[in-house]
């Protein structure tokens, strides 16, 4: 049983130097007695107590097909929500094989139909009312992946690669203003996504784990049949690395370095409404910009006082600790000014919205104490 209670009373008045916009122009020198007009006004009162039922079934089996080891996982998830009287059934399956090769490889293929049920934010339309005809967003997807474990310079490594494609419909578009998200409250979009991910994990330095990952992905949507444009979550290229090292004579002293580079996400679409508060669904096609690329370097230095290997302590007060590490971290070490979103400023004369970047935190320091009893 769920309970959602919502009261909305939102309005915007643009005022400057004694006059408000939009205004009815009058002859200079005469009194403007026109009514005060708001740029938009949204009001709604909602109170619902819906019931949601859900369940799932799963089947797993491992067996040999000749010399090939086979893993099968299949299942189905179902739910019903009486707010919109929708029943969804989501089947999915994964099939994996591990050949009897000298190389340690695992191949997997997975697919299914997945639903994202709407909740408070998604069911609320731009008029401030709950839409009882809203449907779950749906994705039909297939994923191919490979795990390759090997040894290089006599140290263990694992390379994981993955490629996927998703066909999506019944999407609910949303708008971004600064870090605020507002959904359209309508299933008026469809889209697709595809991408490739690769991650190398292993001991670049003996005894400590590090990793490198890279990915490329695109996400598009088509709102009201107007054509495909990038979704606000369109990530494009991303590269990241986590590297650890230690002093040979003092292995309990460790340093780590984290590098991240990512193409900028779409800047989002301003919440564009007319004077009656009606949404402008053309806006996403007018504001196709991307944020600047995201770049960040984090540096950390730590000292391991106690662990279960070379620094084990028996007896006394410190014997109560299984692990004890003190670390100092510098986040965003090069003080790079990254942009997280845009704040949209409206020009009342042209009704165009200009983006003003919202910056993330610059360089800062952190001291961390980790322990395990």
Regions inferred by a protein language model and the residue ranges of each:
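Transmembrane beta-barrel strands of outer-membrane/channel proteins
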Residues: 1-2, 74-78, 93-95, 109-113, ...
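Outer-membrane beta-barrel transmembrane domain signature of Gram-negative proteins
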Residues: 1-69, 188-195
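Surface-exposed extracellular loop regions of Gram-negative outer-membrane beta-barrel proteins
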Residues: 46-82, 90-92, 200-202, 206-218
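Residues that define the transmembrane beta-barrel architecture of outer-membrane proteins
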Residues: 49-55, 87-89, 138-142, 165, ...
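Gram-negative outer-membrane beta-barrel transporters
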Residues: 63-67, 165-167, 187-274
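Short loop/turn motifs that connect adjacent beta-strands in outer-membrane beta-barrel proteins
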Residues: 64-70, 100-106, 151-157, 206-207, ...
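Membrane-embedded beta-barrel scaffold of Gram-negative outer-membrane proteins
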Residues: 98-100, 108, 136-194, 326
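C-terminal beta-signal and adjacent terminal beta-strands/loops
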Residues: 210, 260-278, 303-373
């Amino acid at each position: 049983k769920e309970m959602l209670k919502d009261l909305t009373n939102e309005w915007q008045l643009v005022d400057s130097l004694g006059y408000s916009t939009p205004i009815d122009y009058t002859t200079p020198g005469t009194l403007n007695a026109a009514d005060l007009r708001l740029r938009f006004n949204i009001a709604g009162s909602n109170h619902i107590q819906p019931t949601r039922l859900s369940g799932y079934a799963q089947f797993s089996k491992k067996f040999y097909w000749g010399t090939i080891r086979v893993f099968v996982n299949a299942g189905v998830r179902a739910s019903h929500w009486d707010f919109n009287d929708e029943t969804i059934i989501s089947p999915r399956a994964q099939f994996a094989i591990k050949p009897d090769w000298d190389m340690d490889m695992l191949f997997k293929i997975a697919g299914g139909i997945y639903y994202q049920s709407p909740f408070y934010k998604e069911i609320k339309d731009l008029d401030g009312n709950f839409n009882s005809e809203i449907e779950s967003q749906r994705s039909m997807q297939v994923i191919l992946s490979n795990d390759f474990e090997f040894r290089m310079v006599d140290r263990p490594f694992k390379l994981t690669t993955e490629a996927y494609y998703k066909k999506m419909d019944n999407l609910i578009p949303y708008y971004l203003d600064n870090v605020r998200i507002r959904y359209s409250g309508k299933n008026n979009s469809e889209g697709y996504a595809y991408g490739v991910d690769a991650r190398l994990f292993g001991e670049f330095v003996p005894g400590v784990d590090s990793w490198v990952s890279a990915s490329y992905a695109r996400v598009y949507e088509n709102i009201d049949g107007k054509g495909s444009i990038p979704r606000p979550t369109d990530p494009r290229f991303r590269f990241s690395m986590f590297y650890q090292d230690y002093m040979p004579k003092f292995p309990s002293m460790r340093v780590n370095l984290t590098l991240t580079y990512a193409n900028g996400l779409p800047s989002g679409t301003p919440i564009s409404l007319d004077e009656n508060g009606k949404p402008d669904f053309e806006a996403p096609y007018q504001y196709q910009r991307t944020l600047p690329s995201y770049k960040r370097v984090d540096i950390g230095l730590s000292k391991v006082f106690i662990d279960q290997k070379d620094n084990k302590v028996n007896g006394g007060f410190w014997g109560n600790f299984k692990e004890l590490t003190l670390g100092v971290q510098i986040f965003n070490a090069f003080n790079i000014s990254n942009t997280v979103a845009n704040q949209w400023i409206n020009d009342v004369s042209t009704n165009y919205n200009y983006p003003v970047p919202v910056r993330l935190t610059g360089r800062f320091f952190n001291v961390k104490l980790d322990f395990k009893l």
